[in-house]
Amino acid sequence: MAIKERIGVVVSDKMDKTVVVAVSNRVPHKKYGKIVGQTRRYKAHDEENACHVGDRVRIRESRPLSRTKRWAVTDVLVAANRP
């Protein structure tokens, strides 16, 4: 089975070694066929606390690290503008 990967934007970095990543997806509605946007929020492990709000990151599936955390940040693709 392949390891799942997602690309999303960090929306929260307030927890220690954990970030919340919002992954957006556009899919057709089952009945009407209109393209609608869906956003799913994943809690991901960030060992070095390197990610900040607004960063575009790649996450991959991992073993369960806590009750809700099953993803890990692999790399930061685009860092957010910070002063």
From Swiss-Prot:
One of its GO terms (biological process) is translation. It comes from the Bacteria. GO terms for cellular component: cytosolic small ribosomal subunit. One of its GO terms (molecular function) is structural constituent of ribosome. Gene3D superfamilies: Nucleic acid-binding proteins. One of the primary rRNA binding proteins, it binds specifically to the 5'-end of 16S ribosomal RNA. This is Small ribosomal subunit protein uS17. It comes from Acaryochloris marina (strain MBIC 11017).
